[in-house]
Amino acid sequence: MVKQEPETYSWDDFVNDGRTDWTGVRNYQARNNLREMTAGDRVLFYHSGKEKAVVGMAEVVKSSYPDPTASDEQWVAVDLKPVRALKSPVLLAAIRYDKRLSQLPLIRQSQLSVMSLTKDEFDIIVATGDGKTRKKAAAKKK
């Protein structure tokens, strides 16, 4: 999951750009999470600030490389492209309410700008945003 204040760079900005380099991350744990991303990985896009909601899904199109905005080579960036918006934003309040998401870094380390999710956590959030329960989502795959 990547977080951004919509006033700085919104989901709509991202969609209009069609692709972006995710630069400027200067937190060691967030940097380590960027390093773990590889091309083809799916990422959730979270609006922080006033909105506090997961709003879309993106894909990593270029694995980590040295961040061109950093003077120090220890910092990395990845390139992302939008995949699709969720049908409805998944509010932080809904994430906090869902016991299956209680270990989510978004709740436990709220200042972290880039965080890893398990496949189950990712799927739960996407199903919630698309108005499906996990059982309904699983049934459609069969």
Where are these regions (language model features)?
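Hydrophobic beta-strand signal
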Residues: 44-45, 59
